[in-house]
């Protein structure tokens, strides 16, 4: 029964990750909250092996499932970028990946340097709740001010300067609950990208950022010390997050073409209020 409950927990977290990784609602924030609600850490590791590093690694591996969904959905774009890699070619793949690399640097540097401190100080429901509400208010004002006033409709036309500024905004997502997607989309609005282009640039930007974060987490643990059920849980969570993300990303792009982002902002505010109420009844610990 304990093993079954562990698998169910992994499925729940995989679903949450797949839904929230690319939406502007903060996947990390939702993971922290859900893990707290279902007491995920209980029974995940043998007492002799349990450390926070193992839990962090589990979270990162689950997130890789959602990241893989982007590779699958945008495989044609990725393939073309390497076929047209020469800098002199129209829609040069070299220029595209250079932009992604430049954009990834600010958050990558800060994330690697302050990874442990951020996990220690900010990975808790109270911090997430504050970030959800602050980010929602910022999203509402940014959409009103910048959405629709774009000069760049295609991510192949993003400049190095635009890419770097978007990358600087991504640093705000180091605060769990702020949302990497929300931060980068808002940054992209400010430098002139259309909403769809902003979302797609954010998707691709997740690839190197998540690879770096995952490497940082995994190098601190001995994966071979995990039990067979823990490997099964990791695999199940990875597959579930991959499948769910495949569905959500496609629907998200369709949504952005017709609907405003403030829908997600209102959800964030509502969730923040619910979390505050739950904390008052000691359901979660702030």
Swiss-Prot record:
E.C. number: 3.6.1.27
GO cellular component: plasma membrane
Topology of this chain in the membrane: Multi-pass membrane protein
UniProt record, GO biological process: cell wall organization; peptidoglycan biosynthetic process; regulation of cell shape; response to antibiotic
GO-annotated molecular function: undecaprenyl-diphosphatase activity
Keywords, comma-separated and alphabetical: Antibiotic resistance, Cell membrane, Cell shape, Cell wall biogenesis/degradation, Hydrolase, Membrane, Peptidoglycan synthesis, Transmembrane, Transmembrane helix
Keyword Cell wall biogenesis/degradation among UniProt keywords: yes
Function: Catalyzes the dephosphorylation of undecaprenyl diphosphate (UPP). Confers resistance to bacitracin.
Enzyme class: hydrolase
Family designation: Belongs to the UppP family.
UniProt-listed PANTHER family: UNDECAPRENYL-DIPHOSPHATASE (PTHR30622:SF3)
Name of the protein in its database record: Undecaprenyl-diphosphatase
InterPro entries in UniProt: UppP (IPR003824)
Record bears the keyword Transmembrane helix: yes
